[in-house]
Amino acid sequence: MRLCDRDIEIWLDEGRLDIAPRPPIERINGATVDVRLGNQFRVFRGHTAAYIDLSGPKDEVTAALDRVMSDEIQLVEGEAFFLHPGELALAVTLESVTLPDDLVGWLDGRSSLARLGLMVHVTAHRIDPGWQGRIVLEFYNSGKLPLALRPGMLIGALSFEPLSGPAARPYNRREDAKYRNQQGAVASRIDKD
C-alpha cells in the first residue's frame, strides 16, 4: 500500500524519509510528491560506433561508453536544455532523496508532459530501499517538436510504498551499488555489472 499525502508528511516530519530541499505542502498531493528538474544533463555525442556490445569484454564496453557519452552539461539559471525528437538525454532531479531500508520509491512522469511526447524515465522508475542521492531522469522525446526543459520546472512525481520489513541489502550498503550517492547525471555503468 502506497503512502498517502498525510503519511508522506509524517514520514518527512519524523525524518524517516528525507527529500532535500523539503517540498512545500502544495507539492505533496494525494499519494505523490512533485519533483523538479535539476541543472545537470548528459547526452550522446556524435559518434561513428556501429553498436555497443553490452555483453562484450568490460574494457571494450567501457571504451565504447566513453566514446559515445558527453561530459556532464551544467546549465546556469535561466538557460534551457533542448531535447529534440528521437533523442535520449539524462538529467537529474533538483531534489535529493534518502529512503529508509523499509521503503521503496517510484518515479512517474507528468501526464501533461507525456502528452507532448516527453518520457521522463525510459524503464528505470524504481528507487530502491536505502537509496540516497538525486534521481537520474532518462528523457526521451517521442513527439514531433523540440522541447525546452528548464531547471526548476516540475518534471515528475514520487510515490512511496512501505515494505513488509527492512531490506537485508539496502542499496547504499551494497558493495555493487554503481550509483551510490549520485548527485549528477551519471552515465550508464553497465560495464560494472
UniProtKB/Swiss-Prot annotation:
UniProt record, GO biological process: dUMP biosynthetic process; dUTP biosynthetic process; nucleobase-containing small molecule interconversion
Keyword presence, Nucleotide-binding: yes
Enzyme class: hydrolase
Assigned keywords, A-Z: Hydrolase, Nucleotide metabolism, Nucleotide-binding
Membrane-spanning residues: none
Pfam family, one: DCD
Subunit structure: Homotrimer.
Protein's UniProt name: dCTP deaminase
